[in-house]
Amino acid sequence: MSNFIVLGSSSSAEWDAYLNQLETKDIYFSSAFFRLFEDGEHQQAELFVFKQGDQLIVYPYLLRSISHLPAVIQLGLEGDWYDISTPYGYGGPISNLPPGAERSELYQQFSETFTDYCREKKIMTEFVRFHPLIGNATEYQSGLTTEWNRNTIYIDLTVGSESELIRHYGSNHKRNIHKLKSAPFTIRNSNLKDRIESFSELYYGTLNDLQADSFYYFPKKFIEDTSHLLEGRVELFEAMDGEKTVATSIVLHERPWMHYHLCGWDRAYLQWSPTKLLIHAAAKWGMENGFECFHLGGGYKGNDDLFQFKHRFATQLEPLDYYLGKRIFFPELYERIISFCDTRISGNYFPLYRHPDLDMICIPSEEIGPNGERSFA
């Protein structure tokens, strides 16, 4: 008898019922959040549920078709092939067991079962963005290459008062927030549904200013869907100069945690640093509404200036560790696939055949050997 089931997002009630059996859960694991990333064609959400009696491990991910990619077509693989990835945010497998030998054994059994499932399903690769607050990277390692990516920062919301909240800030942040409170700025907690255009304008403008990777350019429909699918679990905080929005942030939440999810600002107001007041107001709101932690995330690359900016909101707390996990289920086929790509790129991108700068130019058919290998003659 099978000890696992696989659910799609259409089984949202059952999906979320399994999450409710966990002591620790987060909005990034919810069926509603995963529905944001489904495209109806090449990408669908799945929840892998592994059960041993009352013991449980759940693992939500995106099942993504690779059969339509030029290099895969050129290789002539039969049937449907896929890879899996956790979406933007944090994820990985989580269990209802407390830390200890019993949970470690359950993860080992889960890993073996999940590996067999992936190979049978023709899943080429797996990419995991582990959850810094849960720390599940240390549990799920069998067959996986796990690497530290960066530190992330969180604000402790259990301190009891606004003055205690501010006491944990760096001296520069304290001064700026005090000045901003007496400046002509106000903070508004708005309904995202009513502010799609305003948020999008500042968000995309900020990405352009930062010359951000294409990965972060979520379409406007994604923002609209966020307002609908996550209703009741999404807040929009805006820093206002009169009726003009000068900084804005989407905060996602599911008790006990909040996440600083997407943000934007008007570069003309950067000298005022209104984002500091925005983050402080969101933290104060979270504290007043019974949340325990406000996760700010990390920098763009390592412990850069953005990381330092966030760290000054939590100077008395140790940063968290953010890990990535990578696995190739069919190594020989993977190497053959990427050999059919125009690989004039470098770096550690995984899986390589999805690199956004990859031309994906297939090798001409006359360069393909009788066994599907690339001929370099």
Name each model feature, range by range.
Residues 1-6, 10-14, 49-54, 97, ...:
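Solvent-exposed, well-ordered amphipathic alpha-helical segments
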Residues 15, 43-45, 285, 313, ...:
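Tryptophan-centered motif/residue detector
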Residues 63-67, 133, 141-163, 289-377:
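Active-site/acyl-donor-binding loops of N-acyltransferases
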